[in-house]
Amino acid sequence: MARKSLIQREKKRQALERKYHLIRQSLEEKSKVSSLDDKWEIHRKLQSSPRNSAPTRLHRRCSSTGRPRANYRDFGLSGHILREMAHACLLPGIKKSSW
């Protein structure tokens, strides 16, 4: 189980990313069609936004344990939790296959 502070930090990053998403997106679109001087100004504005508002700072975490590695996007679970839940028939449509 991940520490509670790490899970809360990730939630804070997600909230910041949602808050600044449209602003960052519009600035990035403007920078594609602008002159060099305008690009410098847009770059300065992007740099002045909070660091944690960038989408690259986000990590996917397991929804049950908070584990940051080996996550399946379709389920939002880490690999070992997915396996345990699939064996317990808690995930609809998932069958254990072995051959």
Swiss-Prot record:
<protein>
    <recommendedName>
        <fullName>Small ribosomal subunit protein uS14c</fullName>
    </recommendedName>
</protein>
<keyword id="KW-0934">Plastid</keyword>
<dbReference type="GO" id="GO:0019843">
    <property type="term" value="F:rRNA binding"/>
</dbReference>
<dbReference type="GO" id="GO:0003735">
    <property type="term" value="F:structural constituent of ribosome"/>
</dbReference>
<dbReference type="InterPro" id="IPR023036">
    <property type="entry name" value="Ribosomal_uS14_bac/plastid"/>
</dbReference>
<keyword id="KW-0687">Ribonucleoprotein</keyword>
<keyword id="KW-0150">Chloroplast</keyword>
<feature type="region of interest" description="Disordered">
    <location>
        <begin position="46"/>
        <end position="66"/>
    </location>
</feature>
<keyword id="KW-0694">RNA-binding</keyword>
<dbReference type="InterPro" id="IPR018271">
    <property type="entry name" value="Ribosomal_uS14_CS"/>
</dbReference>
<keyword id="KW-0699">rRNA-binding</keyword>
<dbReference type="InterPro" id="IPR001209">
    <property type="entry name" value="Ribosomal_uS14"/>
</dbReference>
<keyword id="KW-0689">Ribosomal protein</keyword>
<dbReference type="GO" id="GO:0015935">
    <property type="term" value="C:small ribosomal subunit"/>
</dbReference>
<comment type="subunit">
    <text>Part of the 30S ribosomal subunit.</text>
</comment>
<dbReference type="GO" id="GO:0006412">
    <property type="term" value="P:translation"/>
</dbReference>
<comment type="function">
    <text>Binds 16S rRNA, required for the assembly of 30S particles.</text>
</comment>
<dbReference type="Pfam" id="PF00253">
    <property type="entry name" value="Ribosomal_S14"/>
</dbReference>
<comment type="similarity">
    <text>Belongs to the universal ribosomal protein uS14 family.</text>
</comment>
<dbReference type="GO" id="GO:0009507">
    <property type="term" value="C:chloroplast"/>
</dbReference>
